[in-house]
A protein has these predicted regions:
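Conserved ABC ATPase signature
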Residues: 152-156, 160
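Conserved ABC transporter NBD signature motif
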Residues: 71-88
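H-loop/switch region of ABC-family ATPase nucleotide-binding domains
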Residues: 213-214
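Conserved ABC ATPase "signature" region
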Residues: 115, 129-148
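H-loop (His-switch) and adjacent beta-strand-loop-beta switch element
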Residues: 226-238
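Catalytic Walker B motif of ABC-type/P-loop ATPase nucleotide-binding domains
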Residues: 177-181
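Conserved catalytic motifs of ABC-family nucleotide-binding domains
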Residues: 173
Length: 265
């Protein structure tokens, strides 16, 4: 859905994501406490922290699947609006962790998975089914999977499966991607290829990305900005300004792999 010129100007200055004094509890335990942060259009933000620090909890709260603590838990604003609304469905692409290899009895193809993403498209009600194939093919092209489009997902590598999930999100015409550990279960070449893809989406498509990763080296190479989360925000800035990269990497649940084949800014 096209935005008016006035709406585009307003969105250019309004952060895609605004979080104010956010606190979230799970099973009666406070996991996130008084977080404040903004994410602006076209930013690639990496979210790191030890296991149990609230990274996935934060993503689920942004998606509206978890609620702030009642009365005192702060707020989440998306595209200048209060909370996750129905109109946001097509604008936010959720990329969960791909997990283990798909069983052989699952016979769905890459193209069929990606076409599912078009069901959330903002323009579906305007253009109808005639644009479904075009959007799916465009998404496959963006992630480099055109030649795998008719392959069954059980035959994909970890990196190819993760690209398929990203393509499904892109097919919805999302302009804000939330990714939860997309590098898990992929080999080094696939990891670097995925990071290059995300970097290209930011620079060429002006995509906004918030990505959770336990791989501090990889996310530092790719992201414009790093947020280190442990209960609250302990660091928020460029990766080169991290106060002590080696000590952060030594915390539980974070890996720091030296690699000269990554890319960065």
């Amino acid at each position: 859905m096209e935005l008016s010129a006035a709406a585009e100007r307003r969105e250019s200055v309004t952060p895609v994501l605004q979080i104010r004094d956010l606190s979230v509890a799970r099973s009666g335990e406070v996991v996130i406490q008084e977080i404040n942060l903004d994410v602006r259009k076209g930013e690639f933000v990496g979210l790191v922290g030890p296991n149990g620090s609230g990274k996935t909890t934060l993503l689920l709260t942004i998606l509206g699947l978890l609620e702030p603590i009642p009365n005192t838990g702060g707020e989440v604003r998306l595209f200048g609006n209060d909370g996750f609304s129905k109109s946001d469905h097509g604008r936010i692409g959720w990329v969960p962790q791909a997990g283990s290899k798909i069983p052989n009895h699952i016979r769905i193809t890459v193209r069929e998975i990606v076409r599912l993403g078009t069901l959330n498209s903002r323009s579906l009600s305007v253009f109808g089914g005639s644009s479904i194939n075009l959007r799916a093919e465009r998404a496959l092209e963006m992630v480099g999977l055109v030649d795998k489009a008719d392959s069954e997902i059980s035959r994909l590598s970890g990196g190819e499966l993760q690209r398929t999930i990203i393509a499904r999100a892109l097919a919805s015409e999302a302009d804000f991607l939330l990714l939860d550990e997309p590098l898990v279960g992929v080999d080094l070449p696939s990891r670097n290829s995925l990071l290059k893809l995300l970097d290209d989406l930011c620079h060429q498509e002006n995509m906004t990305i918030l990505m959770v990763s336990h791989d501090l080296t990889a996310i530092s190479q790719a992201a414009h900005r790093i947020i280190y989360l442990e209960g609250g925000v302990r660091f928020d800035g460029p990766s080169e300004d991290l106060p002590d990269l080696s000590s952060l990497a030594g915390l539980r649940g974070i890996t720091h792999v030296h690699d000269d084949h990554g890319h960065g800014h």
